[in-house]
C-alpha cells in the first residue's frame, strides 16, 4: 500500500503486508521505485527482514508497525445465549476436544496437509473444524472429498466463512486453535486473537506468527513443516490442566495486548506521520 503524507507532501511511504516471489524484471523496477521512498513500514519483523534482503534495502529505512488486533473486542465476555446459538447453528459437538483451523480455504494455508495428520491421530476424542472463506471452490471441494475419502465426516467438517461474532464464539468453544500454513505469513492474526481469549494454540513457528508466540513454551510451537511433531504436541497440549495453562495464557495475553493491539498500531502510525511532518 502506498501513502503520501498530506502534512509533508514530499514524504512517501510504502507499507508491506507480505512477501511473495515475483518476476525479476518487475522486481528490478519495483526496487528502483523503493529507493525513492522515504519510509517503509512492515507489518512484522519477518516482513522487514525479508524485504530488506529481497530488495537490498537499508534496514534502518524500514519501520515495523505490527498489525493490530482488536483486543477489547476479543476480551469482551460472550453471552450464554450466543454460545447456545452457535452450538445449534453449526451443530457443534462440545463433548469432544475441538481443533479449530481458522483460515481461508486455499492451497498455501495448509488445510489438506493438516487433514492428513488428523487422519493419522486415530483419536475419537478430537473433532476438526475448518473455518474460513470458501471462495476457492476447487480447493474447498478437494478438501471435502478428502474428508469423505478418509471417512472423517463424523469428526471433521468445513464450516466456511463466519461472521466475526460467530468466529469469536467458535474460538471460545474450541480446545486448540491451529495454524500450519505452507508459506510463512506476513502476520497471521488468528493466533493473536486466540491468545487474547487465552486459548491453547499450536502453530508453525515462522513468519509474522513467530513474534506472537514469543512468550509461549515450545510445546505450543512446531518447526515449519515438521508434521511428525504435530500429533504428539496436540495430545500433550490437551493434557495441560487449566491451572497450569492459566499462568501461561495470562502472560501471553498481556504480551499480545501490549505489542499487537489495534490501538498500538494506530498510535504508531500517528507518531510516524507526525515525525515525518516536522
Task: Kindly give the residue locations of the regions a language model identified.
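Single conserved hydrophobic/aromatic residue that forms the stacking wall/gate
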Residues: 1-8, 12
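Conserved donor-binding/catalytic core segment of Leloir-type glycosyltransferases
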Residues: 41, 93-109, 115-118, 129
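Carbohydrate-associated surface elements
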Residues: 46, 68
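Glycosyltransferase donor-sugar binding loop
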Residues: 69, 102, 127-144, 160
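Short alpha-helical donor nucleotide-sugar binding micro-motif in glycosyltransferases
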Residues: 161-162, 169-174, 189
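Short hydrophobic beta-strand element within catalytic cores of glycosyltransferases
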Residues: 200-203
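Conserved acidic donor-binding segment of nucleotide-sugar-dependent glycosyltransferases
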Residues: 215-228, 236-242
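A charged, aromatic-enriched C-terminal amphipathic alpha-helix characteristic of glycosyltransferases
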Residues: 243-274
Amino acid at each position: 500500500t502506498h501513502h503520501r503524507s498530506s502534512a509533508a507532501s514530499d514524504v512517501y511511504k510504502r507499507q508491506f503486508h507480505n512477501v511473495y516471489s515475483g518476476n525479476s524484471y518487475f522486481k528490478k523496477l519495483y526496487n528502483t521505485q523503493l529507493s525513492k521512498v522515504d519510509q517503509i513500514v512492515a507489518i512484522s519483523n519477518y516482513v522487514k527482514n525479508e524485504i530488506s534482503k529481497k530488495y537490498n534495502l537499508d534496514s534502518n529505512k524500514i519501520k515495523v508497525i505490527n498489525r493490530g488486533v482488536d483486543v477489547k473486542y476479543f476480551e469482551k465476555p460472550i453471552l450464554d445465549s450466543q454460545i447456545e446459538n452457535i452450538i445449534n447453528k453449526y451443530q457443534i459437538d462440545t463433548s469432544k476436544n475441538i481443533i479449530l483451523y481458522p483460515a481461508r480455504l486455499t492451497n498455501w494455508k495448509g488445510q489438506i496437509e493438516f487433514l492428513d495428520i488428523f487422519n493419522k491421530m486415530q483419536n475419537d476424542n478430537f473433532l476438526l473444524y475448518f473455518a474460513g472463506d470458501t471462495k476457492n471452490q476447487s480447493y474447498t471441494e478437494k478438501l471435502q472429498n478428502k474428508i469423505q475419502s478418509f471417512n472423517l465426516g463424523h469428526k471433521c467438517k468445513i464450516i466456511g466463512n463466519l461472521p466475526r461474532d460467530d468466529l469469536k464464539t467458535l474460538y471460545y468453544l474450541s480446545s486448540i486453535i491451529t495454524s500450519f500454513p505452507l508459506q510463512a505469513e506476513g502476520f497471521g492474526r488468528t493466533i493473536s486473537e486466540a491468545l487474547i481469549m487465552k486459548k491453547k494454540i499450536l502453530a508453525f513457528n515462522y513468519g509474522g506468527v513467530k513474534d506472537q508466540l514469543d512468550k509461549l513454551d515450545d510445546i505450543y510451537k512446531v518447526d515449519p513443516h515438521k508434521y511428525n511433531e504435530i500429533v504428539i504436541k496436540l495430545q500433550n497440549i490437551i493434557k495441560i490442566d487449566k491451572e497450569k495453562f492459566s499462568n501461561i495464557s495470562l502472560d501471553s495475553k498481556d504480551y499480545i495486548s501490549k505489542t499487537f493491539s489495534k490501538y498500538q498500531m494506530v498510535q504508531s502510525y500517528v507518531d510516524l506521520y507526525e515525525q515525518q511532518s516536522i
